[in-house]
């Protein structure tokens, strides 16, 4: 089985590799640089989902893969939170028939100073967090979640949960009409 990932970010590519390998066994994962078609910092569920779907579709279109996978993180409004926003990773999986399945991982809040920079300066959360901890490659490694959880959950693991959730209908095709 061949799986194309609409990203070259190791935290995304390895998450896809590990989940697909665990479910399907032998799998070839091909990272493909694509344009998400949404702002670098998506805001709102619609924008975030659109980014994940665009990544998945472009990945499969540019290859002969069986599946295209897109992962997009974005902020969305949540009442009663400290900042008013939470971050969530959405995953889209598209197959050769064009069927799309979606999933997302756990949501979490960024520090208020990071959210302020996003909305006042237009800075992407990954960049703002990288600057906060003096690591410009943070989003390609443990991610903000790795810093915020003191290493208890890293970005790859967060992405793996989103990928697994997007595969739930494919693991149970008879219940989802696939």
Swiss-Prot record:
Reactions that this protein is recorded to catalyse:
XTP + H2O = XDP + phosphate + H(+); ITP + H2O = IDP + phosphate + H(+)
Q: Kindly report, in one word, the top-level EC class recorded for this enzyme.
A: hydrolase
Q: Which free-text remark accompanies the cofactor?
A: Binds 1 divalent metal cation per subunit; can use either Mg(2+) or Mn(2+).
- What is the organism field in this record? Thermococcus kodakarensis (strain ATCC BAA-918 / JCM 12380 / KOD1)
Query: What EC number(s) are associated with this protein in UniProt?
Result: 3.6.1.73
The record's section on Pfam families has: NTPase_I-T
Q: Which cofactors, by name?
A: Mg(2+); Mn(2+)
- What is stated as this protein's family in its record? Belongs to the YjjX NTPase family.
Q: Which residues form each disulfide bond in the chain?
A: none
Q: What is this protein called?
A: Probable inosine/xanthosine triphosphatase
